[in-house]
């Protein structure tokens, strides 16, 4: 049996595009949990890199914008080159809390060779309505492509085992790439997903914490994700049978304290 994964066994990969507002807080929070942080600067034209220049991290710079998918690919490649057992991805805008990193690792040990998703289930009513609707619609399509239900397919805070990081030739860019990673891991490796409840932070009308405007564009990006996933579903065939199988396979929530099941309802959700 493999030794449990600990923080030094993984890398934190942070794709960043014009994140000068929050990037230092994000990186310092990640370093407090894990000594191995890889920042992918996607052609930023602000002071993103300068804000963290004195911190003990690896920085990979794109001279021009290549998209989040390219950033994740480069981060995965660097992590695999250095022999890490997995990668935790998190966004550079501060919406993900580094305090959830130990819980992601705990779930990775409870469910070996699973992708672990930080699912935005806590205080979900605070999520902007347009984002919540887009996420729920995307969840349906991506789950169909994978063959099983998933809680929050579009969260950027995830643990990927090394076997998934090493997958080559994954199509798609930006948010489409993250969706395709789940589908390819399922179809090519038989890897399932498990989710842990997290709270994602959003810009409030008032308050001291500021975030930059999201790079996610609901109509544009949802269309790109949906059209791509539909193409994948059709390519795999047996569309109705796959739909029935997906509906019959509940999402997995790693919730050892019972926090989520006591407060929110996915009645078909399995907890671990």
What are these regions (language model features)?
Residues 14, 27, 35-44, 60, ...:
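Short beta-strand/loop segment that forms part of the nucleotide-sugar
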Residues 21-25, 46-54:
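Acidic helix N-cap motif at the loop->helix transition within catalytic regions
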Residues 33, 54-56, 189:
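Short, structured coil segments at secondary-structure junctions
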Residues 41-50, 94:
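A conserved acidic beta->alpha catalytic loop
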């Amino acid at each position: 049996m493999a030794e449990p994964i600990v923080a030094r066994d993984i890398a934190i990969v942070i794709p960043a595009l014009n994140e000068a507002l929050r990037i230092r807080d994000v990186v310092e929070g990640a370093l407090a949990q894990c000594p191995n942080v890889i920042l992918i600067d996607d052609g930023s034209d602000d002071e993103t890199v300068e804000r963290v220049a004195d911190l003990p991290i690896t920085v990979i710079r794109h001279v021009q914008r290549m998209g989040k998918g390219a950033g994740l690919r480069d981060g995965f490649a660097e992590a695999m080159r250095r022999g890490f057992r997995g990668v935790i991805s998190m966004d550079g805008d501060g919406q993900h809390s580094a305090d959830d990193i130990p819980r992601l690792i705990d779930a990775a040990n409870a469910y070996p060779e699973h992708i672990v998703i930080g699912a935005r289930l806590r205080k979900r009513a605070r999520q902007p309505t347009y984002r919540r609707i887009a996420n729920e619609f995307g969840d349906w399509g991506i789950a169909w492509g994978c063959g099983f239900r998933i809680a929050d397919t579009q969260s950027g805070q995830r643990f990927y085992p090394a076997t998934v990081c090493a997958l080559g030739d994954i199509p798609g860019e930006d948010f489409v790439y993250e969706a395709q990673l789940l589908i390819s891991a399922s179809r090519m490796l038989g890897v399932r997903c498990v989710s842990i409840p997290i709270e994602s932070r959003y810009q409030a009308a008032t308050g001291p914490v500021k975030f930059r405007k999201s790079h996610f564009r609901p109509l544009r990006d949802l269309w790109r994700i949906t059209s791509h996933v539909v193409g994948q579903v059709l390519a795999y065939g047996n569309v109705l049978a796959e739909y029935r199988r997906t509906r019959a396979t509940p999402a997995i929530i790693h919730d050892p304290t019972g926090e989520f099941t006591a407060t929110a309802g996915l009645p078909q959700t399995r907890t671990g």
